[in-house]
């Protein structure tokens, strides 16, 4: 009982000591953390001080903040220092308590060892009677010896545990797991004397008591040394005590192991580690333990008794070490698992050193493994064994893997299955993949992938390609045939020569029989060489011809493709005449184009609002048809376009740009529809839906004129051609011209946009065609650049053409008045060149603003009119009778401005290349890329607004200065009168169309002021610019300070309906105002020059 109490006290002391140790560890951690924080804070303070040294003194607040920060840092540093000192003191206190507890524990251990001595005596007596108890004592002694290398006696072993406990405490505080090292050194350190001393007992005991150590003894041992599970003879007496104590000791050992590295042997000693509860738990009859032990016992006995004690000691220490290890934690549970197997209890993992105990050890290790996974010693042993086993396995596996070879077929199948599995998984994640895998994408032909629009071009491209290939093949075949023929001819010639030579040789041979053979041979050699040379020459020439043919074909193709691009701007002019004629059929419904243009003669009267329209249409009936064909030709065929554009450029007058203002009355909607289709073709759905409708169209008309002048670099066109185009835009011709360039794009939309175009035509159908044609096709950059060139060119052209325009104006004055009256008649007659002229006059009539313009800028309207009439009449005339004539006529003006148009073309070529084919097809006006249309539309609207302002100003000026009755009548017949009166400054080269002129007047009155304004808008940018300039001039004369905004407001009043229909106001931004101001200033400067 005393023993049990001692064990309990010891356990309590151990628990308290462990508690102190954990507290010390925690404090040390805190201390480390505090030290780190202190170091960090100090470094931070130093860094801040260092950084602040070079900082200039800041505001008081900043200084205060810095000071507070430094104070806070210093305070933190002080706090940390205080904490560190406090923790150090606490750690010292805990360590002192721990030392006291450890001393107490040592005292208890000494007492326990004293009691153990008595048990040992008993065990010795038992061992003599029944070796089991002796064996257990030997094991216990062995444990003591292993634990204490110093102890030589059993007493010493008893004393050693306290020492070991101290060592263990130190180790635990250091968290060092040196148990293994200590056990081994202990065993090894045992002097032979010690070994012999203990072995003496161990030999006798081992022999006698393999696993039957007396339980009480086991108790003692278990407490200090884990006596191996001792089912000693005394088990009955001390069974209960042993069980309780052993369990407590086991618990403590487990706790110690868990908390510390009790795996060390010291742990076992201190923790009474394996109190191998087994000793008590393994209680069994003395016989049974003996029997259980007998298996291993015989060996032990044999080894112990027979083997010299030294050997036995060597093994027993190992066993003891093993037991000690078990005590550390391995064997704590072993005894319970090994109930009845007293041998197993003694056999600790370490006992594996002895072959006999190894089996026991193996068993024990299994049991210990179950409960003692935390033991490092055991883990160490496990590492050894499993590592070996694992290495062996690896070797085996490697060998096995080498052998593992599947047949290629099986591998292929497995690979297929693997891929299918991967596919199935991938399909789950991305079902779209399934379509690709399971239904591999059947390569779609290009035709299936392309849209309808592109499909047609692709087919044409393929056809061209096939044609080229066929042509090349044919050429090759022809060349080959020629070569063959040449070769045959050469062969024949050679044969003839040979025959001749043979004859000669024969003659020679007859005459000179001796020399004949040599001569013949010689001749033959010559012939052969000749043949070779000839064939080479033939091959060379054939190849050269073939190469030339290929080059020619390539050049022609390249020319055909590149021409539209090169003349992208000129086609602009050309389209005015040529394109219009070709494209109106395309853009307008081709059938209707011809019919409509023809009807234009009759409709021209109706279109008196758009006298230009009637003129161009009437002209369009004949010339427009011709022009349409020409346009279609040039546009449909890039090569054709190129020539047409060239012709236009050559036509000095951009009148060929049939800017016949087609101010179509509502009744003329048929024509307007056709034109609107063409115009609408120009207009994109976005443009139509942009709320710009009529206004947009009008602005677009101006834009078309501007773009015509700009894109064409149509400085001439801008005035004559542009003004003409403005009216032309109204007229089918102008519409067709402008829209025709656009027709490719607008063909489809033209019909859809007919309504819009009609509204445009009402407000200035001409504008839709020109605007539509221009705005979509013309690139904004081109417009801008061309606009600059055009403005300059306009000034120059105006100066040059003022005379012409004046002459034309005088002609137009009479002709236009007549055409206005006879516009309808001219409309019918318009098919001829005269009709376009007449129609041009009506467009002038149709734009009352033009009249005002004419009055204010008399030069411009007159010139415009003259140019219009000339242009439309010439282009239509040329178009009907000869498209080139129109082109040529245009070239004269174009000749003057050709440099501008060419420059503009060159500038626009790069940007247009992408969209050029379609845009160019549409005509010079279609040089704009669709992306730029919005900008161009804005510019157009701005120009339209400017034109409206100018119209208002002109109206005022007309009222004030009514230059002539025509001018007064101009409001009713704005375009005609305006054109007449604008003669002096305008570049219009009007070839008065007598009959259209008659129609013009009648159309003019019909044209509403809106249409007149629209007609004005269709005027070329040059016209509008000149009119604006004149208006500004008049403003200066009148000292009118109306800002462009106020003038816009006035124009809004005049054209309130148009403004309501459109959203021009939203376009009036500061930039727009500045832009307008810039245009006026530039014009003024130019005029002043």
From Swiss-Prot:
Q: What is the effect of changing residue 794 to A?
A: Reduces binding to RII
Q: What positions belong to coiled-coil segments? A: 70-107, 928-958
Q: How does it sit in the membrane?
A: Lipid-anchor; GPI-like-anchor
Q: Which UniProt keywords apply?
A: Cell membrane, Coiled coil, Glycoprotein, GPI-anchor, Isopeptide bond, Lipoprotein, Membrane, Phosphoprotein, Ubl conjugation
Where is this chain's protein located in or outside the cell?
A: Apical cell membrane
Chain segments carrying region PKA-RII subunit binding domain: 782-795
Tell me the tissue specificity: Highly expressed in lung and weakly in thymus and cerebellum. Little or no expression in liver, heart and cerebral cortex. All isoforms are expressed in lung, but KL2A and KL2B isoforms are the principal isoforms in cerebellum.
Specify where the region named Disordered lies, as residue ranges: 165-194, 210-231, 289-362, 429-517, 592-644, 712-783, 800-899, 915-934, 946-1021
Q: Where is the composition biased (Low complexity)?
A: 348-357, 471-508
* Alphabetical GO biological process terms: actin filament organization; cell surface receptor protein serine/threonine kinase signaling pathway; protein localization; regulation of cell shape
Q: Where is this cross-link: Glycyl lysine isopeptide (Lys-Gly) (interchain with G-Cter in SUMO2)?
A: 370
The Swiss-Prot or TrEMBL record annotates one GO molecular function as: protein kinase A binding
Q: Where is the composition biased (Basic and acidic residues)?
A: 173-183, 317-328, 455-470, 801-814, 850-871
The cross-references to Pfam families, in alphabetical order and at most eight, read: Paralemmin (PF03285)
Phosphoserine sites (modified residues)? 318, 348, 553, 678, 682, 734, 847, 936, 964, 995, 1002
Its GO CC terms are: apical plasma membrane; side of membrane
Glycyl lysine isopeptide (Lys-Gly) (interchain with G-Cter in SUMO1) cross-link: located at 370
Listed Polar residues bias regions: 329-347, 712-749
Q: Which residues carry this modification: Phosphothreonine?
A: 743
**What is recorded about the protein's domains?**
The RII-alpha binding site, predicted to form an amphipathic helix, could participate in protein-protein interactions with a complementary surface on the R-subunit dimer.
UniProt function note: Binds to regulatory subunit (RII) of protein kinase A. May be involved in establishing polarity in signaling systems or in integrating PKA-RII isoforms with downstream effectors to capture, amplify and focus diffuse, trans-cellular signals carried by cAMP. Binds tp and modulates the structure of the actin cytoskeleton.
Q: What is this protein called?
A: PALM2-AKAP2 fusion protein
């Amino acid at each position: 009982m005393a023993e049990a109490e001692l064990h309990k006290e010891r356990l309590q002391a151990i628990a308290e000591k462990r508690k102190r140790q954990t507290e010390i560890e925690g404090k040390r951690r805190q201390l480390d953390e505090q030290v780190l924080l202190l170091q960090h804070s100090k470094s931070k303070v130093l860094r801040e001080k260092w950084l602040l040294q070079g900082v200039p003194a800041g505001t008081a607040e900043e200084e205060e903040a810095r000071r507070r920060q430094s104070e806070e840092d210093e305070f933190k540093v002080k706090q940390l220092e205080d904490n560190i000192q406090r923790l150090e003191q606490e750690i010292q206190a805990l360590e002192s308590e721990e030392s006291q507890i450890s001393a107490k524990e040592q005292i208890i251990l000494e007492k326990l060892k004293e009691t153990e001595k008595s048990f040992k005596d008993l065990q010795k007596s038992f061992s003599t009677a029944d070796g089991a108890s002796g064996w257990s004592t030997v094991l216990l002694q062995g444990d003591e010896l292993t634990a204490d290398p110093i102890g030589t006696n059993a007493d010493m072993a008893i004393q050693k545990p306290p020492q070991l406990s101290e060592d263990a405490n130190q180790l635990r505080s250091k968290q060092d797991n040196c148990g293994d090292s200590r056990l081994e050194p202990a065993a090894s350190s045992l002097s032979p004397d010690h070994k012999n001393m203990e072995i003496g007992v161990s030999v006798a005991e081992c022999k006698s008591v393999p696993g039957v150590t007396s339980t009480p003894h086991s108790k003692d041992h278990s407490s200090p040394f884990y006596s191996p599970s001792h089912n000693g003879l005394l088990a009955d007496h001390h069974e209960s005590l042993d069980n309780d104590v052993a369990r407590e000791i086991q618990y403590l050992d487990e706790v110690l192991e868990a908390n510390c590295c009790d795996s060390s042997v010291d742990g076992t000693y201190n923790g009474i580690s394996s109190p191998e509860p087994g000793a008590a738990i393994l209680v069994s009859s003395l016989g049974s333990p003996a029997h259980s032990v007998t298996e291993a016992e015989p060996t032990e006995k044999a080894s112990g008794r027979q083997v010299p004690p030294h050997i036995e000691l060597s093994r027993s220490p190992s066993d003891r070490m093993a037991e000690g290890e078990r005590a550390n934690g391995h064997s704590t549970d072993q005894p319970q698992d090994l109930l009845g197997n007293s041998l197993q209890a003694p056999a600790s993992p370490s006992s594996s050193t002895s072959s006999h105990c190894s089996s026991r050890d193996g068993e024990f290790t299994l049991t210990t493994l179950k409960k003692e996974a935390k033991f490092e010693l055991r883990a160490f042993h496990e590492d050894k064994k499993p590592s070996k086993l694992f290495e062996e396995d690896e070797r085996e596996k490697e060998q096995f893997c080498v052998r593992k070879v599947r047949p290629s077929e099986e591998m292929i199948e497995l690979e297929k299955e693997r891929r299918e599995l991967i596919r199935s998984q991938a399909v789950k994640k991305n079902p779209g993949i399934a379509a690709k895998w399971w239904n591999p994408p059947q390569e779609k032909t290009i035709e299936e992938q392309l849209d309808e629009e592109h499909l047609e071009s692709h087919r044409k491209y393929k056809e061209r390609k096939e044609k080229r290939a066929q042509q090349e093949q044919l050429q090759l075949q022809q060349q080959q045939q020629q070569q063959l023929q040449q070769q045959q001819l050469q062969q024949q010639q050679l044969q003839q020569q040979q025959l001749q030579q043979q004859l000669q040789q024969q003659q020679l041979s007859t005459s000179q029989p001796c020399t004949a053979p040599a001569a013949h041979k010689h001749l033959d050699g010559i012939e052969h060489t000749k043949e070779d040379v000839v064939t080479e020459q033939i091959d060379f020439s054939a190849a050269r011809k073939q190469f030339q043919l290929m080059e020619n074909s390539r050049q022609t193709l390249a020319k055909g493709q590149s021409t539209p691009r090169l003349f992208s701007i000129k086609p602009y002019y050309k389209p005015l005449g040529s394109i219009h004629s070709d494209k109106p059929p395309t853009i307008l419904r081709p059938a209707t184009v011809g019919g409509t243009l023809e009807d234009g003669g009759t409709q021209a009267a109706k279109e008196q609002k758009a006298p230009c329209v009637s003129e161009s249409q009437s002209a369009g009936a004949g010339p427009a048809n011709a022009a349409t064909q020409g346009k279609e030709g040039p546009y449909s065929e890039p090569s054709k376009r190129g020539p047409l554009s060239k012709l236009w450029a050559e036509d000095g007058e951009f009148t060929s740009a049939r800017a016949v203002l087609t101010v179509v009355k509502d009744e003329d909607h048929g024509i307007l529809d056709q034109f609107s289709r063409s115009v609408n073709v120009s207009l994109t759905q976005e443009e139509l839906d942009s709320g710009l409708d009529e206004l947009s169209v009008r602005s677009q008309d101006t834009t078309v004129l501007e773009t015509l002048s700009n894109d064409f670099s149509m400085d001439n066109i801008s005035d004559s051609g542009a003004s003409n185009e403005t009216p032309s835009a109204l007229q089918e011709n102008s519409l067709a011209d402008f829209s025709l360039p656009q027709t490719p794009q607008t063909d489809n939309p033209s019909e859809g946009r007919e309504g819009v175009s009609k509204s445009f035509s009402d407000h200035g159908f001409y504008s839709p065609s020109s605007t539509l044609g221009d705005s979509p096709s013309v690139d904004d950059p081109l417009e801008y650049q061309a606009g600059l060139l055009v403005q300059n060119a306009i000034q120059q052209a105006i100066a040059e053409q003022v005379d012409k325009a004046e002459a034309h104006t005088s002609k137009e004055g009479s002709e236009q008045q007549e055409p206005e009256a006879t516009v309808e008649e001219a409309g019918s007659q318009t098919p001829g060149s005269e009709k376009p002229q007449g129609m041009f006059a009506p467009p002038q009539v149709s734009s009352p603003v033009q009249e005002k313009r004419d009055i204010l800028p008399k030069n411009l309207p007159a010139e415009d009119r003259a140019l219009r009439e000339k242009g439309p009449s010439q282009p239509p005339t040329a178009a009907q009778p000869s498209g080139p004539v129109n082109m040529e006529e245009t070239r004269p003006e174009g000749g003057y401005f050709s440099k501008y148009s060419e420059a503009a073309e060159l500038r626009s070529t790069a940007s247009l290349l992408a969209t050029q084919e379609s845009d160019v097809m549409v005509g010079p006006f279609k040089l704009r890329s669709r992306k730029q249309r919005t900008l161009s539309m804005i510019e157009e609207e701005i120009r339209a607004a400017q034109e409206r302002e100018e119209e208002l100003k002109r109206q005022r000026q007309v009222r004030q200065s009514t230059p002539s009755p025509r001018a007064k009548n101009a409001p009713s017949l704005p375009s005609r009168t305006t054109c007449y009166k604008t003669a002096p400054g305008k570049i219009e080269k009007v070839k008065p169309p007598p009959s259209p002129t008659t129609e013009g007047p009648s159309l003019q009155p019909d044209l509403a002021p809106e249409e007149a304004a629209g007609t004005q808008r269709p005027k070329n940018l040059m016209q509008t610019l000149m009119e604006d300039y004149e208006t500004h001039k008049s403003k200066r004369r009148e000292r009118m300070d109306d800002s462009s905004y106020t003038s816009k407001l006035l124009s809004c009043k005049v054209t309130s309906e148009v403004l309501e229909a459109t959203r021009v106001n939203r376009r009036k931004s500061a930039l727009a105002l500045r832009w307008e101001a810039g245009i006026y200033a530039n014009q003024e400067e130019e005029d002043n020059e």
